[in-house]
């Protein structure tokens, strides 16, 4: 079946977003993911909730939101420090559901650092609704090579 590849099924992506070049491994399973670099050099990551992301109530599955929060918050270290990172701990608060068709966005800000350990606070939202708040502790690893353009 190729109905998911037809042009009329491709969702409209908000202006300023580009599809992330993450087509292998876990990214292939949960994507596609999108990213926008804002005028103030901050970033926003996003995804469109599809049927594949839902639980039995047709809400975006909490595990999907947690995986997305991990990528959205951890990216603050990639962007600011130009380093790879791994998650040490993530605390999430689910505030409201995201439904099929919702455009989910998220970002994070580094709020603390001790040696190679960073604390990042972030928010996940749909429009004006907060879906999740999160705080993550991440360990920075080696320096990242420059990103290739897709």
Go through each PLM region and give its residues:
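Terminal targeting signals and extreme-terminal segments of soluble enzymes
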Residues: 1-150
């Amino acid at each position: 079946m190729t109905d998911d590849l037809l042009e009329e099924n491709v969702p409209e992506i908000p202006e300023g977003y580009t599809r992330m070049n993450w087509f292998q491994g876990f990214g292939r399973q949960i994507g596609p993911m999108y990213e926008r670099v804002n005028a103030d050099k901050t970033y926003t990551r996003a995804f469109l909730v599809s049927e594949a992301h839902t639980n039995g109530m047709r809400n975006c599955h909490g595990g999907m939101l947690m995986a997305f929060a991990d990528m959205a918050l951890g990216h603050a270290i990639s962007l600011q420090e130009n380093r790879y990172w791994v998650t040490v701990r993530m605390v999430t608060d689910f505030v409201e559901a995201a439904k099929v068709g919702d455009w989910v966005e998220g970002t994070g800000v580094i709020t603390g650092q001790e040696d190679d350990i960073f604390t990042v606070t972030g928010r996940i939202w749909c429009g004006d609704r907060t879906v999740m708040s999160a705080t993550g502790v991440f360990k920075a690893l080696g320096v990242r090579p420059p990103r290739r353009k897709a």
